[in-house]
Curated annotation (Swiss-Prot):
Source lineage: Viruses, Riboviria, Orthornavirae, Negarnaviricota, Polyploviricotina
Gene encoding the protein: NS
Pfam families: Flu_NS2 (PF00601)
Keywords, sorted A to Z: Host nucleus, Host-virus interaction, Transport, Virion
GO cellular component, one term: host cell nucleus
Name of the protein in its database record: Nuclear export protein
């Protein structure tokens, strides 16, 4: 995994956790949780690709990994829409920068997961 991506995840999660968005803080916590989950999933998929012989093990361990992959893409699309919405509604420049970087990171992670999954197929 690219060390820049790791630091990007950590930076964005840290900054999102410091935001105070009033009544929507529960929604923001949900987004943070999904970001963390997405990072873990991407990391595990990347590790499986690094050990190409692990494909058989991955398929045995999780017979529904393609279904899970589809759900992750839905989750990414939902997060992208949520981040876009927040970006449009906030006037705070710190939040705008954070959400713009989060959006860029989501696009990068989506591409990485697609690349990993094609290598596993």
């Amino acid at each position: 995994m690219d060390s820049n991506t790791v630091s990007s995840f950590q930076d964005i999660l840290l900054r999102m956790s410091k935001m105070q968005l009033g009544s929507s803080s529960e929604d923001l916590n949900g987004m943070i949780t999904q970001f963390e989950s997405l990072k873990l999933y991407r990391d595990s998929l990347g590790e499986a690709v690094m050990r190409m012989g692990d494909l058989h093990s991955l398929q045995n361990r999780n017979g529904k990994w393609r279904e899970q992959l589809g759900l992750k893409f839905e989750e990414i699309r939902w997060l992208i829409e949520e981040v876009r919405h927040r970006l449009k509604t906030t006037e705070n420049s710190f939040e705008q920068i954070t959400f713009m970087q989060a959006l860029q990171l989501l696009f990068e992670v989506e591409q990485e997961i697609r690349t990993f999954s094609f290598q596993l197929i």
